[in-house]
């Protein structure tokens, strides 16, 4: 363990949210005692945390959780009814805080604005009414392909208000990635921006969305967010500015709501349609307001895909009851969010951190900053101006972003109002962590590391602002999380030794399953260690602190963006020059990982520099520019196990020079020599 470099101040130990909770409930030993009690008496903790967070129950739950079916089938807050919109928005209006800012936003071109809690509530009610007019009923899926901004923020609450399920899509995805997720979700509506701006360039999102819809015939309606004057032309070349949009409700086929969903993750298969009708966000948001519906606590509001190492992306399911309690706990106690805070996390509406911060901050009565664009345009000081101009007090980032900023060596004072720094997405290097703490944060802010994921609905490990910190460390498991470290023999390794992060009991934010994949859910998270959640992160413990070292699987993380190799490989083998492919993440000093593709040429086909460049373009087109491969390497064969699985870890080790480890399952060792030769020659 390194020396402690940050020690808690009275702002947190006396005046913070953890301190207030401990005083109220007679916890004299601070965070450590509270964490222990929250694990040994989880029903005691979550009942009191939900009240402290401000969860509004329309009907109080019969109990906190029902785990009689085992960890994988735990039901949280059974018998209760709620709607997260009441907890996040209406509660503040009833308390007279409707004029408080809920969202500040800014675009790369300098356009900015503020929405109050009153305005978010009113706008989300009208958008919800517009969705209702399109035939959206409780349980229907509404996808959002949007950059960060007021529309993405309002859409989240609009869907929740009427019991629709939001399907967020990364704004940098290409057509294939979008289509796969739309079809898997059976989305009925897609909301897209006409365009977004990054690095001063305009990116046409509407054309990407329309191309994806050709393969996603389940979508009945396309809603386009465009500037009302000067709308961009449609793909046919005709201007859409004066073309009548399909009226809200045109072609809609109303369906009965499905409140019985809570016990069934197998929805109806998507149905084909002749093509989506188009309307605009402006028309949608002009509808009659919809009332907020009361829902069983197990009703889903979020279907968010995460990528695995094999197969299609996995659809995780988060609910009106469990998700707000989980993220409310983390943002209230670990990030110490308060009503006068402005929270800014560098993320995208397609990733878990956007709904986590949106829901967590509004539960606290705080304000969210959403920024559309790149934070280093026109230069790297843009981020500091954003933080100062909007009075950001709680800022979250990835280690990749910190490394990028550190590499440019900006000489800029720490933002004056910052009081908490957050971090997630990947492990830190000590040099980057120290820069983030000292240079960026001015040595006065705790660095709240969080480790979780899309399927977690929040975090499993986190830092606490009431405890001292050493570089790169976590204080340990989050409140209410019964986490442990286990080796391959299912025992706890010695202090300082690495094992897998596991969880022994359910938590409120845990995904309710995988969309249309009950068996896959059980196999993925509970198959290797029955009765325990296997998270796949490699972690260790030294003293009271925990450290994260990476992943067990082959997930690729490019600048904090997660991608499974199967999606990349699908794009690569779509090229006529390629017979087989393997995608791996290779350590990169700024991005965290760079994407490398290894391709076996098709019979009689060349695979040289021109073909490699073409393949790189294919991947970027299919999955988005962020996932453009750094290298495409032609190889005669890929290393495989006896059952035919590609051993990506060996390919990665050949590039990095790491030890190859166990080769007992490798059936073609000569292939390793061929890859070594290819790396030297190309």
Q: Which residues does each predicted region cover?
A:
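Conserved AMP-binding/adenylate-forming core of the ANL superfamily
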Residues: 34-37, 85-86, 103-157, 174-179, ...
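AMP-binding/adenylate-forming catalytic core of the ANL superfamily
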Residues: 144, 169-194, 388, 395, ...
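Adenylate-forming
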Residues: 147, 189-208, 229, 371-376, ...
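Structural core segment of the AMP-binding/adenylate-forming
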Residues: 157, 161-249, 253-280, 391, ...
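AMP-binding/adenylate-forming catalytic domain of the ANL superfamily
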Residues: 224, 590, 621-646, 658-681
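Conserved AMP-binding/adenylate-forming
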Residues: 371, 388, 421, 428-546, ...
